[in-house]
């Protein structure tokens, strides 16, 4: 008599095993290869100018909404974007908003911004703060035009599920391809265009999740009385809104002090003690004297430098990377680094950008190895 056969169900893979394998394959192998291959210096001449819907710009470090690996092929940086924008005399940018806050440093020229209907004038050397979800647009002075250095944590916002924004007005110089037709949502907002071949191209800031809910946050009112721990969270809802509506939008960096530190001569221009409303970034200017060097240190958080003046090189984990004016230097996580001025006659000036995200999760300290040259 034939025995009855039973098929035993195979056990489900353990979540730990699956996640470990995914982590090893994606982060330890693929991402590691990309990070090792990515350039630490993005040279000005190697980055193309592009006329986009908001401005004419170069993307040194930037998010790619559909492909994180493309981001990492540009530069070994996850949390900081960096773009250089030009506004010709009398021209304006596009008009839009987004959930990630933004920071602009004015390299050349002067002009003004309109943020949520209010005007803010700026000039070379100023730092401009754009709070989360602020509707903003840049206008260049008719005599000078303007060159702006821009950063926004777009990649971080995408990861948190609040990427995107709303495009209210295109830059006057932006042109859709010949024969393309605009695409709009039910409210009439421009979301992209359809090419002659039928392919639809979304605009970078279209398709915002739960926009009405986010806008409502800006109308929050304070509690009359805080009685419980839960009430403190309700009050925080108002405090976040109040900060964004009352913060400093233009920092006059010429009025801020230089500090002679172990790392060198530094001027902090975006910092928790400066009430800009920026919660994502720290930003400082640093000078290196002719033939001198910065201190040598290491920190968990990644960092990006934009060279405003001068020429020199970085030593990053023992490897030399040369740079010059208008180049971007990318310092990945946990990289031991030091900057050197190779010009015996002229000083170096650079702008440093870092995210405070690492501070919030307990990795904001600096391991200092060597003082700057005197």
Predicted region positions:
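A short beta-strand-loop-beta hairpin characteristic of the jelly-roll/cupin
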Residues: 92-124, 134, 293, 297-325, ...
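Short amphipathic alpha-helical linker/capping segments at the junctions of internal repeats
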Residues: 119, 127, 167-174, 320, ...
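Intrinsically disordered, low-complexity regions enriched in proline, serine, glycine
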Residues: 115, 160-161, 316, 362
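Ligand-binding loop in jelly-roll beta-barrel domains
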Residues: 76, 123, 132-159, 163, ...
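A short, N-terminal "cap"/entry segment at the start of jelly-roll beta-barrel domains
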Residues: 2-78, 175-279, 365-374
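Short, structured motif recognition centered on aromatic/hydrophobic residues
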Residues: 80-87, 103-107, 122, 127-130, ...
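A hydrophobic/aromatic-rich effector-binding and dimerization subdomain
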Residues: 155-179, 363-370
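Conserved short histidine dyad/triad with adjacent acidic residue
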Residues: 64-68, 82-97, 265-271, 282-299, ...
